[in-house]
Amino acid sequence: MTSIDHALLEGYLVRTRWFGGKGRPFRVTGVRELAELPGDGHGPDVGVYLVTVEYQDAEDGTELYQVPLARYEEIEDRHGHAYVGSVQVDGHERHLYDAVHDRDAMALWLRGFIAAEASGRTDVGGLRFRRVSAGPALDPDLRSSPLTGEQSNSSLRFDDTAIMKLFRKVSPGVNPDIEIHDVLTGAGSEHIAELYGWIETDIDGEVLQLAMLQEFLSTAADGFELATGSVRAALVDPELTVIESGGDFGGEAARLGEALAEVHAALRERFPSERRGQEATTRLARAMAERLDRALPVVPEIEPYAARLRALYDAVAQLDGLEVQRVHGDLHLGQTLRTAHGWRIVDFEGEPGRPFAERAMLDSPWRDVAGMLRSFTYAPGLVEMSLVGRPGEDHQQELRGERAKEWSAIAREHFLHAYTAALEPAGAGSRAGGGAGADAAQNADPVAGADAPAELSPPLRTLVDAYEADKAVYEAIYEKRNRPSWVAIPLVALERIAAG
């Protein structure tokens, strides 16, 4: 077992992309070796460590991070960018590197998955490798490459066969990302990346899930990047309408709405669902109002809309109930991928920072819908903001603003039409928070344009507006603290919602 100095890890954590405590005073208070994967004699062995971080500010709190380290007897210059530090082991110096950036280290994890193919499970060095029966046989010669862009976790691909997400901030218990992907893979869902397996261990009598292996989608494009590209095309010549410019995203939005409806239907069939009474809508409205109260000191610009938002939340409290089920929980365009075979929805971890038990709670599927509607406003808002300030373009800027709103309206309406239309065959009623039936979506033509708004029943319209407002309040707090120049995007949404 390798003993690692806490100060060494503190210096390492602040250099990583995925550490959530950058900018906060913290210290490492514990390091626990969870597992040790033996090498083959030519490469490294790998130690998997659980690092306890305690914060020393007004919020306090403790977090657990997974840190797998490749351990070498000699300095490996080829991995200099992933160097963590050196330690003494039995009088000998060992050099530590972030294992995610080391192909030889990740090959040990790949071997674990291969060994589990026959029985669905194998134990290696303290880690339990699990395989899904439908997964493909894996080639031991697959080469790993870390992916860029991941923030809270680390992802790497094994050539064009599989992608592994390594959870960095971990908690004991079943991770919803693994749980939901396992169920939807078993159901044959076409709108997710198929789950191939996962890695877990036990800690203090509870399961601790560390990584998941999935289908690699070789033709995938990020949904948010696709949307912003569409917006840019629409704003190249703002004298043209969105349809005339070729920047219309309505068809893609409709297909995404259908995909989400099918995922929600599969979750409703395979997990518990129920109807809750008015106490649920009262509790929901209270939570929304409390978030608004917390937001006002941080974002005082919300104040002009606060009274109207409170009235909207009061209307939610008066709804007669809520249909709840398992949902995505943190859905936006960045959690979607467009492939040659359609849309895939990814990252079912839920809202970061919440305990697993809370993320697995039943919720209204309309929360996911509202999250996507917000994303169809964020994409044009971000692009429009990037074009502000060009001298002598006041008229052009005004036109761009109109085209951005037009793009958003088309995408939102197509998405909502398609979502509600796809739910109709399920026969769900139009009660607040439930699946939308014929009376919930009275105009559910998935190819209708922005001039034919989706006519949700009044209770559903109230609920969706409230969820969207609550999401925008959350965004306003985040942007004010992290990207102040972006706070105008959620504020515009709050102005629109407050205006009714």
Kindly give the residue locations of the regions a language model identified.
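Conserved ATP-binding subdomain of kinase catalytic cores across diverse folds
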Residues: 48, 55-288, 341-342, 353-401, ...
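An alpha-helical support segment within catalytic cores of ATP-dependent transferases
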Residues: 129-142, 291-326
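Conserved catalytic-loop position in the HRD/HxD motif
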Residues: 330
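Activation of the activation-loop gatekeeper triad in protein kinase-fold domains
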Residues: 347-351
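ATP/Mg2+ or Mg2+-diphosphate-binding catalytic cores
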Residues: 390, 402-432, 438, 446, ...
